[in-house]
From Swiss-Prot:
It is found in: Host cytoplasm. It comes from Chrysanthemum virus B. GO terms for cellular component: host cell cytoplasm. Keywords: Host cytoplasm, Host-virus interaction, Inhibition of host innate immune response by virus, RNA-binding, Suppressor of RNA silencing, Transport, Viral immunoevasion, Viral movement protein. It holds the Pfam family Viral_helicase1. Residues 1-123 form the (+)RNA virus helicase ATP-binding domain. This is Movement and silencing protein TGBp1. Homodimer and homooligomer. Interacts with capsid protein. Interacts with host AGO1; this interaction targets the host protein for degradation, thereby suppressing the antiviral RNA silencing. The keyword Transport applies. Belongs to the Tymovirales TGBp1 protein family.
Length: 231
């Protein structure tokens, strides 16, 4: 337990509870260093084994990687499950659960023992936009955010959307674009998010959040009237 707590502290995770019990729940923003933290745990103590319901690590010579979860674990290890929000089974076999309940709303939401709100992926302009939209996030990096009209700007970089009508519009203009599910676990230098709304629909909040957090340096939003609000 001491190794686990120390490494989470080293990676900037804030402890929220003085009492810890298994499974230990860790929530964080995109780009908070979750995967790097899990890899550090694997390297620090051979009792840890990590699985994910997201994109697994490629094989390496050390044999230390976050593996694809296939449905069962070896109970003699301290098993960690990443992207636990995608899991619908019994979590009692896991020592720790890592995930982002905002990005992937779980069927079973656990109260967090640790959290991290500082993103090392995107910058302060994106963080400010996300806070204005009601998300808890911070960043000390620099980046660029612009909000453009739907027909006033040509999409650049990786184009992301979540509405079917926008997908049809982009295809009609021969623009290659992706839905959130297609870019899970991926990061791009520049992203253009195209939407038919000027605000976040409550039922699509998690999808918007995913679309707004895939970039490192530049984010362009294209909306009907070049504005975007939480309501």
């Amino acid at each position: 337990m001491d190794v686990f707590v120390k490494i989470l502290s080293d990676f900037g995770f804030t402890r929220l509870s003085s009492s810890l019990h298994v499974p230990i729940v860790v929530h964080c923003m995109p780009g908070a260093g979750k995967s790097s933290c899990i890899r550090a745990l694997l390297k620090a103590d051979s009792r840890f084994v990590a699985y994910t319901l997201g994109v697994p690590d490629p094989c390496n010579l050390d044999g230390l990687c976050i593996k694809a979860f296939t449905g069962s674990v070896d109970l003699k290890y301290f098993n960690i499950l990443d992207e636990y929000a995608r899991y619908n089974g019994d979590a009692s076999d896991f020592f720790a659960l890592f995930g982002d309940p905002v990005q992937s709303p779980p069927r079973n939401l656990y109260r967090a023992h640790f959290k991290a709100v500082l993103s090392k992926r995107f910058g302060s302009c994106t963080a400010q936009l996300l806070r204005e939209l009601g998300f808890e996030v911070e960043s000390t990096k620099e980046d660029l955010v612009s909000i453009r009209g739907l027909y006033d700007f040509d999409p650049v970089g990786t184009v992301i959307y979540y509405e079917k009508e926008i997908g049809c519009l982009l295809r009609a203009h021969s623009i290659e674009a992706y839905e959130p599910e297609e870019v899970v676990g991926k990061t791009f230098e520049t992203v253009t998010f195209v939407t038919a709304e000027n605000h976040i629909p409550a039922e699509s909040r998690h999808l918007v959040y995913q679309c707004l957090t895939r970039h490192r340096s530049v984010l362009h939003l294209m909306t009907p009237d070049a504005s975007y609000t939480s309501t």
